[in-house]
Amino acid sequence: IARSISLQLGIPAYIYDGVTVDELLPINKLTGLPSMRRKGMGHNLNTRAAALRYARESGRDYKDITVIVAHLGGGISVNLHHNGKIEDFISDEEGPFSPERAGGLPMFDVIKECFSGRYDYKGMMKLVKNQGGLMAHLGTTDSRAVEQMIQSGDAHAKLVYDAMILNIAKNIAKCAPNVCGKVDAILLTGGIAYSQYVTSEIEKRVSCLAPVVVYPGEDEMRSLALGGLRVLRGQETAKIFHKSESANG
């Protein structure tokens, strides 16, 4: 898409903080199986925009801050920004469950479910990506509807919602050991960050690590524009990627 627009208008096109941007430190990519590696794929655009905003508002350069950013939306991810890079990333496939995603699950139970005969590959992917989390427990992906259930006295809804919030807090804390706990701030962004119930409960659990700052919502088009502007102004350098021989076939 970027190339076609570039050719039509005769101008350069930049792809900024795509989902597949991966800046994880080598130590954070390792797992218990050499054939499987952790990836820094997820809400990079929105989380870096939040980190850049915090740097700007605190009068510091992005490369000089250390922040943990939690993106709270249909999927929930948490990452660590340090030395101007996203050095650790907990994706929505391994972290807390969310309105739609199942999040991290007990491995042996997942293996059993895969071989139960109830799901093929596509069915299993749909289950964990679109039918998990709040949808699986409460039949809705709308956090506002869940909060209305809680206000109406639904104890089960409160248990599920509070479990999601607790797991968000746990995953925020998991990023801190990367920098020996020396974190400047914890940033909460995404659509669910509009919820005072959610943000106040998270703050109560993680403010012992660092101050919590809330930047609700997503402003991805503006973030893309500002990213391109920083390159044009020379504040950032565009990276050139070449297709490897293996990618050609």
Residue ranges of model-derived segments:
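General beta-strand structural signal in soluble alpha/beta enzymes
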Residues: 12-18, 68-70, 80, 88-89, ...
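Glycine-rich phosphate-binding loops at beta-strand->alpha-helix junctions
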Residues: 183-203
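Glycine-rich phosphate-binding loop plus the immediately following alpha-helix
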Residues: 3-4, 15, 35-64, 74, ...
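Conserved phosphate-binding loops in N-terminal lobes of ATP-dependent enzymes
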Residues: 1-19
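Glycine-rich phosphate-binding/hydrolytic loop that grips phosphoryl groups
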Residues: 193-194, 200, 213-249
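Adenine-nucleotide phosphate-binding core of ATP-dependent small-molecule kinases
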Residues: 126-181
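Short, hydrophobic alpha-helical segments
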Residues: 54, 58, 176, 229-236
